[in-house]
Amino acid sequence: MRISLPTVASTVREIAIDASVYDNKPSVTIVEIMGRHAGWLTAASVLARKFEGDNPVLIYLPEVAFSPDAFIEKVKEKLTKTSNLVVCISEGINDGNGTFVCELASDVGTDTFGHKMLTGSGKYLENLVKEKLGIKVRSVELNVCQRCSSSCLSATDLDEAAASGRFAVSAALDGETGKMINFIRKSDDPYILEFGTADVNEICNKEKAVPEEWITKDGSDIGDEFIAYARPLIQGSVEVPMKDGLPYFAFRK
């Protein structure tokens, strides 16, 4: 998840800049971001804001119930303050009773783990805005790019990934087995992190949700607590190796 935070924030900032060219008439851009039950990546879009009131103006996570009617009213309200509105949503936004928004529009398949394959929440809301408000609207899926792009790597993330690997080797040499490395945040400011081990059975196939107190009461935005948590993770730039004008990756033949 962590490697994707700067990618999501950077991409959403670029989308917001593109949306700003439509100042002459109201427009809505809906960005669908990965996250079935946990909205960490979608929450990262708040880092794209350059100032208070900047896009993305609305952010919706799956941790709180989503109401299409309330969404439309909120869009109408925000369009009175900005003519180009960017909205970020998690693919797993739901009504709080187990029904995903994307299920309101189409049949949904399952993956090899039996989890519902969620696609179409953004498209559903695009059509809803078009139907209810009759304005220019488009939806964008970040899709696999949000987890595989290396264009916005964080030095902090790479350093901690390497350090956790060294910690894991040391733990294995000490005889620990059936464990995963966990990251223990000791402080946000100054940023202090420690490593530990945890039983793999306590972690596999489980999810850590964004704390509800980090989400605004109406469920349409992210609070400062998340920003304090996430901002340290995207610090430091990394020079990506290039060849012939493109990123150059190690690969197996």
Locate predicted features.
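Accessory alpha-helical/coil subdomains and C-terminal extensions
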Residues: 1-138
